[in-house]
């Protein structure tokens, strides 16, 4: 579609743009104490954005703005997931004490800008658009990570984030330039057509360029060895932003990786087809398998050694990126299906774990295991809910985490004997993760003195806890609605429109 025709299908992004402008202008009229009210403008904008997505014809599969963006149910799925994560984080941000004393108008406006950037990430089908989308998300993240300007840890987190982000962006941009030189185009399908004619040194150059591009993608999902920013940034950032970074950009990153490999290395067809990839001359499935093993193993082994729960959850998120990467070398629609289901389940349990950390800290506690000592007796509701999140993150039934891992392992095993070793390594890593997740439960209920006084969280906190804990349990028992939603979303636009 040309630019004017594309606007008719671009309403969600247009609403987001207006939301950002209105939020920034509205903040000018609020005092410092009232700036938190700007959250209402962003929430309203996100609700309208969601309605715009829902009202669009889900059967339309096309491209927008001169073939720069894809419009399909696959993108709509991830946009909805990103909106859900953002809405939950806005409610979580209202309950954190870390933002006290700061104007939060820019905070909520930056969240909306990040959402816009992630919308571009999940729809991009041109390398230049991929780069711009990642930069929009990254720059917003840099500012939000350092939002606590009077906190040295937050300043350090932002600085490290900028340095690592610039490094990975530079490597990715170098890879993009090589691909453009070889293919003569930045469009995914044009690159695919040119790739079939590569020979000798050109084939090697394309392999090298793909690895460089993967560095940029790996940076967004915290895959090893592009994960170095994650622990320090997660620990130093406002915990609400840490929770957000662990979920939304990770989902957008996986959406981008899947689309890139399907439309560059595959035939760009619907994911309902049994075969995801048709071009396997380059060893990228083996590369992703090794990346998955290294990512989940390092994440789990280092998480075991942490005494700070926030930092432990950072390494945990690295391990979960490894679990999701396991499904991609299967070259099948079942693998993509598994990743999408896992991301839905992961959203609730991971945001829930971080929200418990936020609430405990707001009650005068801290982020270390010692601060959680006896928490199950002092705050029984919080302790029970945290236990649910830890069990789910481990992947124990009947929780959402188990269903997510079940689909991942099923996809790997069903792909054939060549990936059985990957399933075995994944199983061993799941057992390893049991140690540090259950350590949290042990500290809460079996260490420290039992408290005579019991603290019951206020109603808004209880509401958020239940909004995260109930789906974590329900989706472990009845996940058919999620499975159906994912199935309907597994459609990519084809080369012939």
Q: Regions from the language model: what does each represent?
A:
Residues 1-497:
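Alpha-helical transmembrane segments of multi-pass membrane proteins predominantly involved
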């Amino acid at each position: 579609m040309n630019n004017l025709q594309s606007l008719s299908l671009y309403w969600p992004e247009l609403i987001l743009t207006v939301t950002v402008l209105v939020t920034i202008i509205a903040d000018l009229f609020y005092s410092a104490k009232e700036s938190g009210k700007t959250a209402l403008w962003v929430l309203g904008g996100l609700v309208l954005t969601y309605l715009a997505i829902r009202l669009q014809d889900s059967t339309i599969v096309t491209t927008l703005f001169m073939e720069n963006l894809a419009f399909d149910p696959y993108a709509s799925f991830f946009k909805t997931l990103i909106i859900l994560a953002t809405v939950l984080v806005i409610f979580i941000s209202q309950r954190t004490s870390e933002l006290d004393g700061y104007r939060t108008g820019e905070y909520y406006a930056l969240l909306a800008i990040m959402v816009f950037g992630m919308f571009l990430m999940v729809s991009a089908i041109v390398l230049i658009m991929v780069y711009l989308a990642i930069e929009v998300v990254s720059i917003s993240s840099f500012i939000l990570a350092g939002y606590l300007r009077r906190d040295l840890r937050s300043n350090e987190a932002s600085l490290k984030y900028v340095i690592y982000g610039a490094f990975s962006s530079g490597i990715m941009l170098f890879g993009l330039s090589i691909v453009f030189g070889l293919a003569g185009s930045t469009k995914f399908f044009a690159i695919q057509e040119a790739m079939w004619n590569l020979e000798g040194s050109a084939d090697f150059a394309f392999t090298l360029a793909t690895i460089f591009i993967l560095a940029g993608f790996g940076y967004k999902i915290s895959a090893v060895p592009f994960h170095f920013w994650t622990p320090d940034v997660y620990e130093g950032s406002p915990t609400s932003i840490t929770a957000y970074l662990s979920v939304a950009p990770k989902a957008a990153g996986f959406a981008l990786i899947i689309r890139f490999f399907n439309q560059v290395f595959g035939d760009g067809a619907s994911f309902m087809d049994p075969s995801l990839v048709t071009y396997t001359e380059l060893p990228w499935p083996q590369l992703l398998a090794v990346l998955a093993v290294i990512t989940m193993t390092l994440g789990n082994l280092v998480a075991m050694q942490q005494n700070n729960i926030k930092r432990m959850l950072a390494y945990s998120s690295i391990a979960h990126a490894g679990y999701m990467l396991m499904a991609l070398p299967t070259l099948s629609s079942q693998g993509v299906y598994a990743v999408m289901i896992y991301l839905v389940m992961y959203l609730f349990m991971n945001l829930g774990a971080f929200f418990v950390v936020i609430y405990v800290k707001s009650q005068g506690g801290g982020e270390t295991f010692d601060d959680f000592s006896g928490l199950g007796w002092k705050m029984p509701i919080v302790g029970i809910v945290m236990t649910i999140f830890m069990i789910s993150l481990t992947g124990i039934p009947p929780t959402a985490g188990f269903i997510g891992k079940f689909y991942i392992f099923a996809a790997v095993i069903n792909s054939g004997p060549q990936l059985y070793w990957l399933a075995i390594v994944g199983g061993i890593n799941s057992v390893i993760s049991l140690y540090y997740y259950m350590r949290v439960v042990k500290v809460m209920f079996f260490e420290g003195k039992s408290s005579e006084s019991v603290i019951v969280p206020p109603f808004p906190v209880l509401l958020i806890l239940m909004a995260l804990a109930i789906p974590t349990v329900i989706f472990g028992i009845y996940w058919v609605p999620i499975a159906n939603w994912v199935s309907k979303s597994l459609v990519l636009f084809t080369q012939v429109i």
